Amino acid sequence: MEAVVVDAGSKLLKAGIALPDQSPSLVMPSKMKLEVEDGQMGDGAVVEEVVQPVVRGFVKDWDAMEDLLNYVLYSNIGWEIGDEGQILFTEPLFTPKALREQLAQLMFEKFNVSGFYDSEQAVLSLYAVGRISGCTVDIGHGKIDIAPVCEGAVQHIASKRFDIGGTDLTNLFAEELKKSNSSVNIDISDVERLKEQYACCAEDQMAFEAIGSSCRPERHTLPDGQVITIEKERYIVGEALFQPHILGLEDYGIVHQLVTSVSNVTPEYHRQLLENTMLCGGTASMTGFEDRFQREANLSASAICPSLVKPPEYMPENLARYSAWLGGAILAKVVFPQNQHVTKGDYDETGPSIVHKKCF
């Protein structure tokens, strides 16, 4: 039985058999609907409550996570109780040791897996483009991770995490749309879809500031029939990544953060890191973002200009969205056949802490 790879993000869960040249077979929202009794209504009335197991990259509700994985592995992947296989999880930057152990415990004690491995998303994303060294800029739904990787090892002392991401950009977009469409009530799920359809980046800061009244308005009809107009708001979403003050943050833009992160690594690696920069995460697919990032990089004060890695032609489309999963599929083809993973015997002998010795 082929190993399964799972990349559980704050917004989407990606899962599937480890096939490195294909996209994950399952991509679904990382949320569960929980039915709870409404004490106020009485008569045993039940209401639905949406639960998010993963918040800003980390598992926060383990019961919901167990239910979600149960659905994924048995109802979708095709596992059968008593005949579970091997599994590899992707792991976000700065995952606490306790969470790694809890995941291993869940897999061995609840799902009875025959083998377990987890690896950091930054390393896996680079594997997806054939690199073992480079720097990843991962713009996820709930966080931004910047991680230099040298010879397959994340340089944690130089890495950075920001607790902002696609969800914060969605909220910003909603606020801006409300200003120009004050009579329209827009559901946040509609705003999310509008962001994916319309949000983009200006060529540079000067171009952004010049947009103003010259921006061609787009009229969009919402599912409920309301009509909204989208103008400069579509550019504000992307601009916030380069000018964080738009989000109310006193921080430098994303390119500056990349350069300062790499500057904290041993100088001999600077060129290798900056010249193998990889953008990943759903927000990295925003129209114009890659071009704007490279333009800003060309203007940076760094002695070595950051340049973006081009994905191999044989890799699936939307590599930025699925890079960690694809890298996991590549790694699974190595660690499990070569017995580098945590086995059931390892777990029974040592307990959950074995993951720190065998997974890196």
UniProtKB/Swiss-Prot annotation:
InterPro entries per the UniProt record, alphabetical: Actin, ATPase_NBD
Record keywords, A-Z: Chromatin regulator, Cytoplasm, Developmental protein, Nucleus
Any single Pfam family the record assigns to this protein: Actin
One Gene Ontology cellular component annotation held by this UniProt entry: actin cytoskeleton
UniProt GO BP: anatomical structure morphogenesis; chromatin organization
Subcellular location: Nucleus; Cytoplasm
Highest taxon in the source lineage: Eukaryota
Family of this protein: Belongs to the actin family. Plant ARP7 subfamily.
Role this protein plays: Essential protein required during embryogenesis and all plant development stages, probably through a chromatin-mediated regulation of gene expression.
Record's protein name: Actin-related protein 7
Higher taxonomy: Eukaryota, Viridiplantae, Streptophyta, Embryophyta, Tracheophyta
